[in-house]
């Protein structure tokens, strides 16, 4: 019998992030507590989002609104990294980045976790920015998925190509 396998990746659907950003922008434009604060949210480059407002409290509230929209669109909070508010003239600015991909240190940490705590006979190989996990038994692969979901890793993981 052939080995079963799946890939562990960290990818974010940019269209879903764009939808969350547009929903947040619409809410910021219509909500009563944001009236007159010149609160904006926009893309700055491919993976950077910038939020601006007239006060520090309003920009923090705008970040919370955006995070709420991300969660509603099934995007993990581990994929969005927001900085502290920075004064910028008469406004405050927060830049946040969308994190994608598994770094080599994170990949080593994940494969070590699978080797140490996962079922016997499970192999994990690093392939670029993804990890291929293979085993003879599908039940072992499901146990590895449960292990990784329960682990406190600082990266949003998705499981794809389950065969």
UniProtKB/Swiss-Prot annotation:
Gene3D superfamilies: 3.30.70.860, YajQ-like, domain 2. The keyword ATP-binding does not apply. It holds the Pfam family DUF520. Keywords: Nucleotide-binding. SUPFAM superfamilies: YajQ-like (SSF89963). GO terms for molecular function: nucleotide binding. One of its GO terms (cellular component) is cytosol. InterPro entries: DUF520, UPF0234-like_C, UPF0234_N, YajQ-like_sf. Belongs to the YajQ family. Nucleotide-binding protein. This is Nucleotide-binding protein MSMEG_1165.
């Amino acid at each position: 019998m052939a080995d079963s396998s799946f890939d562990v990746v960290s990818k974010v659907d940019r269209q879903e992030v764009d939808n969350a950003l547009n929903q947040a922008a619409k809410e910021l434009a219509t909500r009563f507590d944001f009236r007159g604060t010149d609160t904006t949210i926009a893309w700055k480059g491919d993976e950077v989002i910038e939020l601006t407002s007239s006060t520090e409290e309003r920009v923090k509230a705008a970040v919370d609104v955006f995070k709420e929209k991300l969660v509603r669109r099934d995007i993990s909070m581990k994929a969005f990294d927001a900085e502290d508010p920075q004064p910028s003239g008469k406004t405050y600015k927060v830049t946040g980045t969308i994190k994608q991909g598994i770094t080599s240190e994170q990949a080593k940490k994940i494969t070590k976790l699978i080797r140490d705590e996962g079922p016997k006979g499970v192999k994990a190989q690093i392939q670029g920015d993804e990890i291929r996990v293979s085993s003879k038994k599908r039940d072992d692969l499901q146990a590895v998925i449960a292990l990784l979901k329960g682990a406190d890793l600082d990266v949003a993981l998705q499981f794809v190509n389950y065969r």
